[in-house]
Amino acid sequence: MRYLTIALSKGRLTDMSVEIFEKIGIDCTELKSSTRKLILSDEKNKIKFFLAKPADVPTYVEYGAADIGIVGKDTLLEEGRNLYEVLDLGFAACRMALAGPAELQGKIDELNIKRVGTKYPNITRNYFEKTRRESVEIIKLNGSVELAPLVGLSEVIVDLVESGRTLKENGLVVLDTIADISARMVVNRVSMKMENERIQKIIDGVRDELSVRG
């Protein structure tokens, strides 16, 4: 029996994923250790894990380097990879939003937006072209996106919003919700066919655990 490989997003999704996997009988001892090993395993269940940057997880899954991945919906929307999205895990919930200065609230249809600051150029382009049918200049940023409208780099931003506290503290508000975001389980298309029974068992186990949690 070959190993199933699971790619986990580095960061807070790792701990949440480990908690669920342990509940369904997967041994995550190595994964929780301080080892420097890049590939970690559960020998009993023939499962291997590795941690990757969130943006890379869909790539590993699409190309079959991982059979299963745990990643945020924001990354899936931005990367647009060809894979199966099989479960909404519900945790790490937030929303992708269009945000800007408070004085623009309620005036979204009147806005003449020319520039948008964001870490998510593909999501932003799709939103403006398909939903708003507008052409804008998208400025790719890597740091604090909220800074862009404050210094005149852009009129508005597209970013993840959780509590909205950072926006509020900087005089910004949500102007429109683009998508609801949470952690998702994804599966390689070929693996889903070739290892269907084993993968489906994991999917069903996680789904049952999530339903118990409500």
UniProtKB/Swiss-Prot annotation:
Keywords assigned: Amino-acid biosynthesis, ATP-binding, Cytoplasm, Glycosyltransferase, Histidine biosynthesis, Nucleotide-binding, Transferase
Sample GO molecular function, one term: ATP binding
Native source organism of the sequence: Ruminiclostridium cellulolyticum (strain ATCC 35319 / DSM 5812 / JCM 6584 / H10) (Clostridium cellulolyticum)
CDD domains assigned to the protein according to its UniProt record, in alphabetical order: PBP2_HisGs
Record remark on domains: Lacks the C-terminal regulatory region which is replaced by HisZ.
Gene Ontology biological process: L-histidine biosynthetic process
PANTHER family, sorted: ATP PHOSPHORIBOSYLTRANSFERASE, ATP PHOSPHORIBOSYLTRANSFERASE ATP-PRTASE
Name of the gene: hisG
Compartments (UniProt record): Cytoplasm
Pathway: Amino-acid biosynthesis; L-histidine biosynthesis; L-histidine from 5-phospho-alpha-D-ribose 1-diphosphate: step 1/9
Listed InterPro entries: ATP_PRibTrfase_cat, ATP_PRibTrfase_CS, ATP_PRibTrfase_HisG, ATP_PRibTrfase_HisG_short
Record family assignment: Belongs to the ATP phosphoribosyltransferase family. Short subfamily.
UniProt name for this protein: ATP phosphoribosyltransferase
Source organism phylogeny: Bacteria, Bacillati, Bacillota, Clostridia, Eubacteriales
Task performed by this protein: Catalyzes the condensation of ATP and 5-phosphoribose 1-diphosphate to form N'-(5'-phosphoribosyl)-ATP (PR-ATP). Has a crucial role in the pathway because the rate of histidine biosynthesis seems to be controlled primarily by regulation of HisG enzymatic activity.
